[in-house]
Amino acid sequence: MLENIQRSWFEHYMVPCFSPAKFIPVRAKGSKVWDQDGKEYIDFAGGIAVNSLGHAHPELKDELIYQIDKIWHIGNGYTNEPVLKLAKRLVENTFADKAFFCNSGAEANEAALKLARKYAADKYGKNKNEIISFKDSFHGRTLFTVTVGGQPKYSQDYAPLPQEITHLPYNNLSAIREHISENTCAVIVEPIIGEGGVIPADPAFLQELRTLCDRFQALLIFDEIQTGVGRTGYLYAYQEYGVEPDILTSAKGLGGGFPIGAMLTKQHIAAVFQPGTHGTTFGGNPLATAVANKVLSIVNQAELLTGVLQRHDYFMDKLSKLNQRYQIFSCLRGKGLLLGAELDKAWQGKAKQLTNLAAEEGLIALIAGPDVLRFAPALNIEFADIDEGLVRLESAIMRFVG
């Protein structure tokens, strides 16, 4: 007999660090989700930019089933075939020489920051330890990464915090020029600030970061947890900007819904991570890396990446026309299928209210702070699903504006 699982169990049994929707999704296919009552939703969230190829993609499912019958976990005392294949694929398709695998974006950023600190200490001495990040950025929930992130609301309750971390204004050339010094070991930046408002970097800003890091012997880290794996219409966003980092972090869409994180870097930097300096129990496990291999084999095709750019134009055109009718958004921005719609002054602070109404109308969407709706659908979302999702968003907006 099937157990009747209730939404109220969340409050009864689970630590309350999340505030989930009142419905429970139980089934999904492509860009559609169904809850316990059979209600259908169009998914414009993609599990927060995770479900890069939608839900239950048949090729990912087949790959996982194939690997399940072979080997699940062996531990880091051994390597395995899927992880070696994935490392080779990433190295051959990016700037990197070496790859490290873990389980999440936070772990990937933790590894990147530790690597940068150790590289600087080994090469230049322990006084070269400052990490520069940017206001409104988000890099994870570990104590190190949450402190490096530029949103104090996430770190203020956990003092004492890691030290020698500086937060500067994003897209501000003068601020970084004035502050960076010989004591800076790394600069970490999101090519598009995601959680903090969907704000793309100015090309000149990223180019200047590269120049300054070279001048002061600091490492440039691109956090591509959210922008990577085709999200912007390129395999990684750095490729569009034409700015090569020293370290890149990837997660979310890399596993297409299966947990995985990766840190990519150059040979001379990776060399400081000798056995025992860093590690992971589950990172690089055969199941996750098998699925990630299949994701990359599908995403890194010209047809799919071109399709992301086409969907960007289509989505933004439809969203702009919707906004002309209601004048609710002051700004539409983003790249590829990482899009933000900032509420006009009269509606600021109410993004969550609007996404709640959207859910009632059968649309799953995200927020990026109190004022911004964020959309990160599957890279292969059907155009008909974009149309239907925006119809449902319009229904929510009609209720929202009263």
From Swiss-Prot:
Top EC class, one word: transferase
Reactions accelerated catalytically: N(2)-succinyl-L-ornithine + 2-oxoglutarate = N-succinyl-L-glutamate 5-semialdehyde + L-glutamate
Chain positions with N6-(pyridoxal phosphate)lysine modification: K252
Signal peptide (residue range): none
Pathway: Amino-acid degradation; L-arginine degradation via AST pathway; L-glutamate and succinate from L-arginine: step 3/5
GO biological process: one example: alpha-amino acid biosynthetic process
This protein's name: Succinylornithine transaminase
UniProt gene name: astC
